[in-house]
Amino acid sequence: MKRREFLHKGSAAMAVAALASCRHVVDWKRLRLVAGANASELERTVLVDARALFEAATGSPVALVDETAEPGAFDVLVGTPESSSRVRPIASVASGAYHVSGSPPLVTISGADAEGARNGLYAFMEELGFRFFRDGDVVPELRGSAALELELELEASPAFRFRGDMIWDNYLGPRRYCASVWNEGDWDRALLYMARNRLNFLEFYPPLEHVLHTVFPEAKGLDNGSVLKSEAKHALAKKVLARARALGIECMYVLSYGAFPEPVRALYPDLEWRNGFLCAHQPELMELTKKTWQVLVEELGTDHWYAIRHRGEEEQVYSDPCRSVTKAQGFLQAFAAMEEVDPEARITVWTWGERIPDLFEEFPANVRAVHIRHGMANVFGDRGEGREQSDGPADLPPERKWLSGQFTVFGGNETLLQTGWCDAATLAKDAVASAADPSCEGYFQWPEWSNTSVWLSDVIAKLAWSPTREPSLDAYARERHGALAEPFLAGFRPLLRAGNARFMNPPRKRLLVPFFLAAASLDVLREVRAGALTMMEHLDASSPRFVRDFVDLYTWLALRQAQTFEADAYLSHVEGESVTFEAARATWSALHAVLEQVPELGIVEAARSVAREGILADGVPAVEDAFWTLGCDFYRGYPLVMSPEAVELVYLDQLDRLETLVKDAHERGEVAALEEPGWFWHDFPDASWADAVRKLPSEDAVRFESVMRERLRLALSEPSTPPTARKLTLDPTLLELTLPEPRDTAVLP
């Protein structure tokens, strides 16, 4: 093995130069992992995980022994001064800090605390060639005997005390993205990804059906749930939380103050309700909330972290609110209720969509802010424009503790490679600015869906540990794809170089976007197509990680190419030409054919996967209704992420209707005028392009719902066996269609 220096520079990290190297012949079959005599649950949990990874790498059993065992030929001792008599205190006292030192026959990994021991162990494994990604791991071959030139001397600590993720399970849809359809194995992979990447914080949405059924046993239907049986969902949550805590991940419960489901509301018909919220001027709100939160904490345990989402009072965009108290007064009620339930509560409130600093000026000093960087101004108006937030802290008093949350997805019809505020360079600038503020305690990702962009997740995990202004796509490519790094970069480098997305809109309200015909937009599309062709040449010799990345890239370029052809055909029609939409149709059809080959991207396949677990709520119609509403039709169709069903039943149908509209108008010697759009967001370099955006004809909504409900009903009632992996087949003609000529501007009726 080549000598590696293994110096990891982190914010607030003290890295000491490596000692002079000395060659050792290491027999990987004699590798042992050594735990302290008083090892914590966290230390033992990650040692068990590391043993499995090392066994995969070495092809041999790896012993896990106590430090009282006789010394071996190659021992890796992991612990803290509290857990092991052989581990000395390290210089850094920061939680999560670690020190790695020594060489075979003994490497010692010392943590400032148990989390630090965990972090040091996985950092050591990365030095040996392991890499940990959301969708799988890179496991090196450590076989037989090897000459190892390695002596380690490293100490590092994280820039942010809390580093992590938010896994949101509000939507139903493709299994890859929607935690609502995850089983225990899916959750375990997500939590292991976090632990292995030295993350320690998770915003978690606790299921409340079982809790509410316990508090309100007379309420009808709470024992069933909307998709899973309440008991089953509750049991899964308990397992997930226990596993997270065993891996050193603290969980913050996200809670709404005032919201209760209909069966509970029915018990109190004489109280004043508004859109599911109990109006806060009534003392019953605090009483019912405290009962609910008390049972929640008793049933699921707590790490004393809570995010209060208060949507029942004034100035809320999601509902017609109660206005009997101010929003600040409602929050103060929630704080008081939570502190009675948990006197050690660490309460947070999001800045997202709020008026700051006004709201926070009324809060106690111990309430933390979670500053959600959203990336679009006037987000709830008809047209969001440009950038909303600056880097670093929000406009809050300097003594207010806060955490930085990165909202990395906003377009359900985007393919999660580009969004409005989250290319790597943008994230890095904010991380550096946030780390420089001593009041900032944490840095985490809010991906809205889960397991979305592997690249951005990797960037955020690294930035949370050690902010840098220049995340390296090249280094990421080498770590993830090894010898196939250059083909990967051929496809992704032009897209990532382009930076933040310039346009987004809700997927079922798809728009015609002439900006995609601008020269710069066409240049990006042309470069990405060339890169995709390069990636295609290597698919047969690639890993599942490479195939996933290719499908993501292919999806981005197909979506962009189809929209480009649509815009060009329509503008040609406006100019009086007879046009065809065949290039757009061929592109959509090719994309549909690819997405159908990836089961975890299908909405119907997600329903099958849930049904296979055998814990569906009673009544297929109710579950079918939940999948339709929360997977396809909730909030103006917003959750409809890119899936084969979306292409087949929405996007192709919209194209057919556009073509019919245009051809009929042309035969009459007229121009088919399209409506001006509803909501969309843009960051066009020339704002005049926004005036040319138009609304495409809507799909046949009745047919879409009918077909989807029928497919969901069948999937839920007769779940098939899990799909088997198969080789991806492609039609390269998509990448060979002649692109339109660029346009400098567009004027539409």
Each predicted region: which residue ranges?
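Solvent-exposed, acidic/flexible segments
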Residues: 39-47, 114, 180-187, 230-234, ...
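Glycine-rich, histidine-containing beta strand-loop boundary motifs that form or position
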Residues: 10, 66, 78, 110-112, ...
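Catalytic-core regions of glycoside hydrolase
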Residues: 55, 60-63, 72, 141-143, ...
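Catalytic domains of carbohydrate-active enzymes that cleave complex glycans
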Residues: 440, 465-742
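N-terminal export signals
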Residues: 5-23
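Contiguous, structured surface segment used for ligand recognition
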Residues: 24-160
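An acidic-aromatic substrate-binding cleft motif
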Residues: 137-189, 193-201
